């Protein structure tokens, strides 16, 4: 599926009451290698590229298992920090909390994110975030990025009990929005399997943010396919 150009997007312009964003790698970057190195340094560990590779070899399959409902968030937390727990003597929940608060200060808005949030807010469109990330990080990160004033709703899978792409998490978001028609909500995310498939299951229009130009899985059909967040201005903002 090709990315749409600005002219094609403008021809697809539609009025949305809500924009619902994924957080990591959609609104924010996520430099986990830096956060983990800082966490390890607190305990006198010189964190190497090999340490990071070993961590991700465990961490990434655990996130897939969580998204597929095969493990819960507590199991994910405990298993991904098993090595650091052994090396530091600190329990996994403590290590995870420290990492999340570190990441809240490290994450930066991606190009075009602030401008889109400001413009949508100014046009009277309400803004939500729906994330599989850990709850402790979310509000501090919004404050650190100075965008909390634009966000009307924060939905965190850890608190709701269902991870994306579970339809129930998106339905929980709709309830918190006071039940708008799903087609008046645009779900925007970088992960076709969680953000786009999950939003579509709930009846929402979807925008796949694909800055690296990856191939779209055959089972996923986003409403819009974009390379840059600023392309959404043509879709969601009223013409001047």
Give short role names for the model-derived ranges.
Residues 9-57, 87:
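Active-site neighborhood of HAD-like aspartate-dependent phosphohydrolases
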Residues 44-54, 85-98, 150, 181-182:
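Short, surface-exposed acidic
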Residues 74-75, 93, 97-129:
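Short, acidic loop-to-helix structural element flanking the phosphoryl-transfer center
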Residues 61-98:
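A metal-dependent, Asp-based hydrolase signature
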Residues 33-41, 74, 78-82, 135:
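An amphipathic alpha-helix signature
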Residues 29, 129-131, 208:
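Hydrophobic residues in well-ordered beta-strands that form the structural core
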Residues 2-19, 46, 50, 118-121, ...:
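Asp-based, Mg2+/Mn2+-dependent phosphohydrolase catalytic module
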